[in-house]
């Protein structure tokens, strides 16, 4: 009798697992379709209106109109690729931070990591006189700023046993400190440095060219491969640290390596496109509502979701009062702020 009951339970679990798998894969396919449509819409958006067929040809330089080839290859396509890399990287970073810290409110913006990177980059531009975001100097100082914040957050989480809500509050405090420090740097900057900093901190996807995408692409690609290789480790962490250790996972090393990689990704993105908030918070939560906490699907979903959200935000910024282009940082903050408050109050009610 017990054997029959056990078989029925196993069958129900198997059916439920298959149903969840089909649902998750279907969601990823739909999300990929939405991303493709957004890419085509973004490719078409602009003052130089062109049929979509000619724009697709322009990607490969095959359009009969040389202006189309020039506009697509030198303007619109680099902007789209920047949004895909930056959005995907931030979405993945948020997903991984939420996993290793076991905190649904964790992201590079809510924990102050992005603000630390912004301060580091501003320090390099103004105090050290690097002058621009080109080269490795600014990203290096952005990484130093972000990793400093991450180590403080990690110390509070592991050694002081601060609650998830306390970690977020600490992140808010750290963000305020670094924002104030960045403002002081701007105050003492000259006119050229100030205009560079202000325009850069607004967030701009159009300032990057093909030469700037290589470093960001490598960092995001390495992080994607590493995180997907450890997808089952993140799933084990959901059951608690003791369970993960019993399965042979070095939790301390996993947490530290992932924090460093998330900081590296955040610093590279910030140094190239400026401060982009809430993508790392919003994207994983939207995907999690559809696929659950299984990182086999949550990781690629967060990458696709982050890329889609940032590209949609950029499309909105470019078209809402065209030809004026609104700062993408402001748009993403408007998108993410309400969701952050919703998650915070929802968590408070549960507590």
Predicted regions and their residues:
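Alpha-helical transmembrane segments in inner-membrane proteins
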Residues: 1-351
């Amino acid at each position: 009798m017990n054997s029959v009951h056990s078989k029925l339970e196993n069958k129900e679990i198997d059916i439920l697992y298959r149903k969840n798998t089909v649902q998750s894969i279907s969601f990823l396919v739909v999300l990929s379709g939405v991303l493709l449509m957004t890419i085509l819409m973004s490719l078409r958006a602009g003052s130089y209106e062109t049929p979509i067929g000619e724009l697709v040809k322009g990607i490969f330089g095959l359009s009969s109109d040389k202006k189309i080839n020039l506009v697509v290859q030198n303007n619109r396509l680099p902007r789209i690729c920047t949004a895909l890399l930056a959005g995907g990287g931030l979405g993945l970073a948020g997903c991984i931070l939420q996993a290793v810290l076991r905190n649904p409110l964790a992201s590079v913006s809510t924990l102050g990591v992005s603000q630390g990177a912004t301060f580091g980059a501003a320090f390099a531009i103004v105090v050290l006189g690097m002058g621009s975001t080109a080269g490795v100097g600014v990203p290096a100082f952005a990484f130093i700023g972000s990793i400093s914040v991450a180590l403080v957050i990690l110390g509070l989480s592991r050694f002081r046993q601060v609650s998830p809500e306390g970690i977020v509050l600490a992140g808010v405090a750290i963000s305020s400190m670094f924002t104030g420090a960045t403002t002081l740097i701007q105050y003492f900057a000259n006119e050229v440095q100030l205009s560079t900093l202000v325009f850069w901190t607004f967030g701009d996807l159009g300032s990057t060219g093909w030469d700037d995408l290589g470093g960001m692409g490598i960092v995001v690609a390495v992080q994607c491969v590493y995180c997907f290789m450890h997808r089952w480790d993140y799933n084990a962490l959901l059951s608690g640290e003791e369970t993960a250790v019993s399965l042979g996972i070095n939790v301390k090393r996993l947490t530290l390596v992932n924090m460093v990689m998330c900081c590296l990704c955040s610093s590279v993105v910030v140094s190239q496109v400026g401060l982009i908030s809430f993508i790392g918070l919003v994207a994983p939560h939207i995907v999690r509502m559809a696929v659950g906490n299984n990182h086999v699907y949550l990781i690629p979903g967060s990458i696709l979701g982050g890329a889609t959200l940032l590209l949609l935000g950029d499309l909105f910024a470019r078209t809402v009062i065209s030809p004026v282009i609104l700062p993408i940082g402001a748009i993403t903050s408007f998108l993410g702020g309400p969701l952050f408050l919703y998650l915070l109050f929802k968590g408070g009610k549960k507590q």
